[in-house]
Amino acid sequence: MARIGDGGDLLKCSFCGKSQKQVKKLIAGPGVYICDECIDLCNEIIEEELADADDVKLDELPKPIEIREFLEGYVIGQDTAKRTLAVAVYNHYKRIQAGEKGRDSRHEPVELTKSNILMLGPTGCGKTYLAQTLAKMLNVPFAIADATALTEAGYVGEDVENILLKLIQAADYDVKRAETGIIYIDEVDKIARKSENPSITRDVSGEGVQQALLKILEGTQASVPPQGGRKHPHQEFIQIDTTNVLFIVAGAFAGLEKIIYERVGKRGLGFGAEVRSKAEIDTTDHFAEVMPEDLIKFGLIPEFIGRLPVVASVTNLDRESLVKILSEPKNALVKQYTRLFEMDGVELEFTDDALEAIADQAIHRGTGARGLRAIMEEVLLPVMYDIPSRDDVAKVVVTKETVQDNVLPTIVPRKPSRTERRDKSA
């Protein structure tokens, strides 16, 4: 295509009939011309049709029970967190739907505000995986950001707007679709300020980042550099409204349980008070009793906590839960490795005590569910190296001794076929 400038015969738009002098730009195709005004009109029509399609999707939003049931198929345990997330996500997208209808009818009686989510719990217990599975179910753009890489504007590091760029990229640069996506910010406990009292010196990677995140968490029209990095005065920006972006902010918050225990322990004073030992509190979900004052003591600023009204906590996974994670979900590790061995024509089997031994190792290492794959790789590496070059193996059996004592898995040889036996005897 060629742009038509001034000079020569007076050309007209093939759609609206305006001459090239009446419009800013006239673009030529094979025998036709279109002006910039008609292009803008076409874009508006397409955007309206896409918005209608999005409304249909919101009308079909699954109910909280359906969301929880979907999560059950992929994530073991963490029932309280699943319920909390299911309700929060359902209400969030219902709020978007109400906003769309209210904008069309101009008489929405109540303005519904956003409820972002704070997830607390040890590493390797499913926080990230829960958020990923939710986004997968809802078919919305999803981006993960690391809070430790962020710094306040003007300092070395990433600006908070780069988080929004990841979401836009996940939506294939469809800004309208990105505006209803989910952003998961991990390691948020690492941006806690260094002390409970405000510091005189700048805390550019702690309190400064919390301050910078406030606006996008609440909802604002943000300017995002299309290539990431720092903003430059002469570059064009992508404008994105974060009002309908759901933020799930998560962290391990190591040490927060001590703050909670100090506060909860004070209840056990005076006659008739319920006294609980530290061991009794530790066996329960201590994060379930978290209060805003605990998070402020930990180092989050009150304004930041106020923008995260929904709190979901995950608990440490015990041996039983880890064994279930290995074998029960739709994409369980045992099923994945069984499929890999099937592709080489070999059956793979884990004994029950082998799965328990793998779970025990993950608990011992303190890596939770995240460490299960590494242990499986260590256990299966010798046979995964050897078996593709062999044609005499029918089955591999992984036992408790294989996991605990580094003994090679039991290899069951394949019985030769009649043809092979006949050829051998000949």
UniProtKB/Swiss-Prot annotation:
Keyword Iron among UniProt keywords: no
Entries under PROSITE patterns matching the protein: CLPX_ZB (PS51902)
Keywords: ATP-binding, Chaperone, Metal-binding, Nucleotide-binding, Zinc
Source taxon at top rank: Bacteria
Binding residues annotated for ATP, in chain numbering: P122, T123, G124, C125, G126, K127, T128, Y129
InterPro entries: AAA+_ATPase, ATP-dep_Clp_protease_ClpX, ATPase_AAA_core, Clp_ATPase_C, Clp_protease_ATP-bd_su_ClpX, ClpX_bact, P-loop_NTPase, Znf_CppX_C4
GO cellular component: HslUV protease complex
Residues of the ClpX-type ZB domain: 1-54
GO biological process: cell division; proteolysis involved in protein catabolic process
Molecular function via GO: ATP binding; ATP hydrolysis activity; ATP-dependent protein folding chaperone; protein dimerization activity; unfolded protein binding; zinc ion binding
Signal peptide: none
Binding site for Zn(2+): C13, C16, C35, C38
The keyword Acetylation is annotated on this UniProt entry: no
NCBIfam families to which the protein is assigned, alphabetical: clpX, PRK05342.1
Function: ATP-dependent specificity component of the Clp protease. It directs the protease to specific substrates. Can perform chaperone functions in the absence of ClpP.
Family per record: Belongs to the ClpX chaperone family.
Subunit structure: Component of the ClpX-ClpP complex. Forms a hexameric ring that, in the presence of ATP, binds to fourteen ClpP subunits assembled into a disk-like structure with a central cavity, resembling the structure of eukaryotic proteasomes.
Designated name of the protein: ATP-dependent Clp protease ATP-binding subunit ClpX
Organism: Mycolicibacterium paratuberculosis (strain ATCC BAA-968 / K-10)
High-level lineage: Bacteria, Bacillati, Actinomycetota, Actinomycetes, Mycobacteriales
